[in-house]
Amino acid sequence: QATDEKLVEGLVAEVERAGRIFLTGAGRSGLVSRFFAMRLMHCGYQVSMVGEIVTRSIVGGDLLIVVSGSGGTESLLPFVKKAKSVGARVAIVSMKGKSPMAELADLVCQMGSQDEYSFVTVQGMPMGTVFELSTLIFLEAIISRIVLAKGLDDDKMRALHANLE
């Protein structure tokens, strides 16, 4: 199923207007958020992963992006509340359009259909695999849009890649 183009445009706009970008997710969704954080950094944005020891305070004008299949992950909800309380914007990438996090978010990027849990079970792809893969592709589409809009090439992005590996 194709993801609504308005979601792509909406998240690109949120990223573009953000002072700094903070990302979080739990479990495998957290890994997907790390993939996106790395690419945003390659595109020149100031990016932090929530929970890292060197992560600064979120403030008004910043953006928190949360990847949560359910939109109700108990360990992530306080981050959403804190971000909102200081005037930061919040974008949620989730399977559910209605959830505790979605109620607080400025932008909800629902993957799949409008059903509560929209992904069919695929044999050999347990639990949230289809959501995680769909989210990864969606977020890579965001990066593609940014790369094209900013005229970035591999050399510019590679110059920002870690060299202490």
Give short role names for the model-derived ranges.
Residues 141, 147-165:
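A short, charged, Gly/Pro-tolerant segment at domain boundaries
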Residues 5-9, 74, 155:
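Generic alpha-helical secondary structure signal
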Residues 10-13, 31, 159:
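Amphipathic alpha-helical interaction segments
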